[in-house]
């Protein structure tokens, strides 16, 4: 496979009304990697931005690296291709450069029975959000009876048929990734494991494990965000290092990941932030800087997905 661009634009939480313009700004700023997902419910608008810049002649499709993700209600093998085609249709693309299993957990599909007509599935997938999180009377997700090893076989078929160039996973712990890598008859290894990663959740052990197995790591939420009064951007250590390098705190947080050989996908719809976030290749953090940032680790996970904690494949019950 070709290398995944080191910095990409995450389209998570980018409202449909603003993400098209954000994609245009990003391409002009030098971004070539765009991280999408069915669950973000904005793929149509992301695709509009991509097509605009291609038509304009600013970029070619083959210059771009477009990733999307399989949602949890479509883990049954017979639904994987339909879900992938849905994302391709929304993006108006012929292929994806990367397709990920969004979470290792399969949910009950949007129909009471596993067998679903194409028209029913088409309706569910064209009304995003309606059936994404099937809940029981306790407001916990209703699991499906799938196994991600079976889902992976359908993901591999997408590569064979040319719908996607590469496949990977997201939010897998090391035991789940090891189980996948040891799968009998494995045709394609996951090229990356996309995980939450920032200085308050450095993921040192999981990154080491993935890289030792030849699986790259992609960091989502690299700027941390705010949770329970904690805002990583305002951390005194990050602020000090930023001042020393005459860079923004966000640039320090992004550079921190690239120096760990971790792909990083910050998200923003603000043009100035989009441009700033990719300007991280003209300076280098010292080893002292890196050690100080690593020392901030507090195992603070922001994306805990609590309504799935009872699922057999919930990934965060173990240390890494």
From Swiss-Prot:
The keyword tRNA processing does not apply. This is 1,5-anhydro-D-fructose reductase. Belongs to the aldo/keto reductase family. It catalyses: 1,5-anhydro-D-glucitol + NADP(+) = 1,5-anhydro-D-fructose + NADPH + H(+). Catalyzes the NADPH-dependent reduction of 1,5-anhydro-D-fructose (AF) to 1,5-anhydro-D-glucitol. Transmembrane segments: none annotated. It comes from Macaca fascicularis (Crab-eating macaque). Pfam families: Aldo_ket_red (PF00248). It is found in: Cytoplasm. Inhibited by p-chloromercuribenzoic acid and alkyliodines. Its main location: cytoplasm. Monomer. One of its GO terms (molecular function) is 1,5-anhydro-D-fructose reductase activity. The keyword Iron does not apply. One of its GO terms (cellular component) is cytoplasm. It is an enzyme of class 1 (oxidoreductase). Substrate binds at residue 102. The active site is at residue 40. The record marks 69 as: Lowers pKa of active site Tyr. InterPro entries: AKR, AKR1E2, Aldo/ket_reductase_CS, NADP_OxRdtase_dom, NADP_OxRdtase_dom_sf. Keywords: Cytoplasm, NADP, Oxidoreductase. Its EC number is 1.1.1.263. It comes from the Eukaryota. NADP(+) binds at residues 194, 265-277.
């Amino acid at each position: 496979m070709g290398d995944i661009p080191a910095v990409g634009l995450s389209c998570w939480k980018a409202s449909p009304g603003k993400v098209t313009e954000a994609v245009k700004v990003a391409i002009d700023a030098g971004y070539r990697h765009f991280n999408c997902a069915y669950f973000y419910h904005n793929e149509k608008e992301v695709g509009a931005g991509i097509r605009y810049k291609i038509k304009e002649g600013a970029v070619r499709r083959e210059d771009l690296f477009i990733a999307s993700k399989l949602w949890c209600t479509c883990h049954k093998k017979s639904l994987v291709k339909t879900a992938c085609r849905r994302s391709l249709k929304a993006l108006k693309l012929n292929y994806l450069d990367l397709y990920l299993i969004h979470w290792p957990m399969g949910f009950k599909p949007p129909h009471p029975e596993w067998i679903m007509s194409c028209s029913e599935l088409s309706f569910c997938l064209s009304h995003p959000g309606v059936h994404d999180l099937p809940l029981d009377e306790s407001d916990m997700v209703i699991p499906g009876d799938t196994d991600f090893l079976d889902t992976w076989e359908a993901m591999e078929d997408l590569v064979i048929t040319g719908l996607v160039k590469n496949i990977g996973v997201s939010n897998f712990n090391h035991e789940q990734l090891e189980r996948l890598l040891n799968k009998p008859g494995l045709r394609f290894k996951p090229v990356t494991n996309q995980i939450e990663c920032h200085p308050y959740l450095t993921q040192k052990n999981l990154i080491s494990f993935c890289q030792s197995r030849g699986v790259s790591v992609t960091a989502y939420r690299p700027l941390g965000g705010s949770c329970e009064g904690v805002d990583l951007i305002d951390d005194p250590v990050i602020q000090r290092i930023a001042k020393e390098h005459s860079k923004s705190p966000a640039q320090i947080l992004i550079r921190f990941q690239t120096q760990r050989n971790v792909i990083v996908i910050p998200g923003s719809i603000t043009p100035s932030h989009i441009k700033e976030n990719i300007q991280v290749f003209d300076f280098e953090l010292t080893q002292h800087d890196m050690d100080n940032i690593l020392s901030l680790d507090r195992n603070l996970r922001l994306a805990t997905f609590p309504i799935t904690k009872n699922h057999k494949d919930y990934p965060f019950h173990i240390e890494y």
